[in-house]
Each structure stands twice: as C-alpha cells, then as structure tokens.
Amino acid sequence: MVALLAEHTDTRQQAGLLVRPDNSDALSVAVTATPIVTTTGTPATPPALELDVQHGDGVSKRNGLPSRKQIEKWVKSALYADAALTVRFVDETEGRTLNRSYRGKDYATNVLTFAYAENDDDPVAGDIVLCCPVVESEAKAQKKSLEAHYAHLIVHGVLHAQGYEHDDDTEAEEMEAIETETLQALGFEDPYKPIRE
C-alpha cells in the first residue's frame, strides 16, 4: 500500500496529484481534492462548538463582562476543529486557588486553560478560566479596552485548548502571530504592540 499526500497552497484551486510511471504497463493514479478552507484561511464549514459560559460567585455583576454572543464569536474565530469548551469568569480568590492547585503558583493570573485532549485524535475539549480583577487591572495598565483584553485572552485560551503552547521562542512567536491575525480580523489592534504612552 502506498499513501500519498499533496498539499496545495492556493486554496482557491483544487489540489491534484498524478502518478504516472515511465513504464506503460504500470497503473496511473490521479487524486484531486476540493479546498477545505476559504481564501482567508478559515474552514469552509465552521467547526461545531458546544459552549458553556459560567460566572463564579459574585462575578456576573461586574462591569465590562463580554456577552455570550461576543464570547462565542471570539471562540469561533480561533477554532480549527469541533470543540466543547467552557469559558468561566472568576474572582481573585478562585483564580488564585486554581493557579496554586494546578500550576503551583500562589497568585491569580489572567487566564488559565485546562485542555482535556490527550492526543491529536481526541476532540478539542477544555475550560478557559478568566480572573476578572486581573484582566481589568491589566487592561487599565496596558491602556486597552476591557473588551479587547477579554477578546485577546479568550483567543489565547482557545489556542491553548487546541494544543498551542508558548514554552519557547518559536512556539511563542507562532502563537502570538495567530493571536494578532485573529484579533485584527475581529477589528482589534495587535495585542502585543508596545503600550501607548
């Protein structure tokens, strides 16, 4: 058995592969494929999303929380496969407890992602936990809107849920490039550009 894989960089055209040996007694094989992505690089059929939005104790009354519609739009913009995700907004106590329990760091951080896929064949599933007081403080310090910062951190979390990491410079550059492109497509500025004075 022979397996052949052809990648076509021009998503506007069909990819084709033809194997025709010099020997006229041999079999010719032709393979064509219809593009599965649009010219913008997004899937032709959007991935299915099962989304649960949760609010920890006392968090639902905070100002500036994104709506479910916004969250769904941001999640889908960074999604490359069908997924079941929970986006949870928490206070500093819950954020700190989770960070200490799962990462051994005794402080609240802006976003934590818990990805449940054990290998590449597993469906995308995960929890994205945002600590509201930290997100609010960072947005103010970075002179960006709270909406833009929530969008960035949700996109960041969705990428983590799909296996993206930033443990070294190469991974960080790749992930940041995807985040920047995704957020700009949503109408936000580059989240990594230097802070305005």
From Swiss-Prot:
EC id = 3.1.-.-
| UniProt remark on cofactor binding | Binds 1 zinc ion.
One Pfam family from the record = YbeY
Cell location? Cytoplasm
Q: Which GO terms describe its biological process?
A: rRNA processing
What are the record's GO terms for cellular component? cytoplasm
Chain sites annotated for binding Zn(2+): H156, H160, H166
* Gene3D superfamilies for this protein: Metalloproteases ('zincins'), catalytic domain
Cofactor(s) required for function per UniProt: Zn(2+)
Which keywords annotate this record?
Cytoplasm, Endonuclease, Hydrolase, Metal-binding, Nuclease, Ribosome biogenesis, rRNA processing, Zinc
> What molecular function terms (GO) are annotated for this protein?
metalloendopeptidase activity; RNA endonuclease activity; zinc ion binding
Q: Which residues form a coiled coil?
A: none
Q: Which HAMAP family match?
A: Endoribonucl_YbeY
PANTHER family in the record: ENDORIBONUCLEASE YBEY, CHLOROPLASTIC (PTHR46986:SF1)
What family is this? Belongs to the endoribonuclease YbeY family.
What this chain does, per the entry, is described as:
Single strand-specific metallo-endoribonuclease involved in late-stage 70S ribosome quality control and in maturation of the 3' terminus of the 16S rRNA.
Report what the protein is called.
Endoribonuclease YbeY
Species of origin reads: Cupriavidus metallidurans (strain ATCC 43123 / DSM 2839 / NBRC 102507 / CH34)
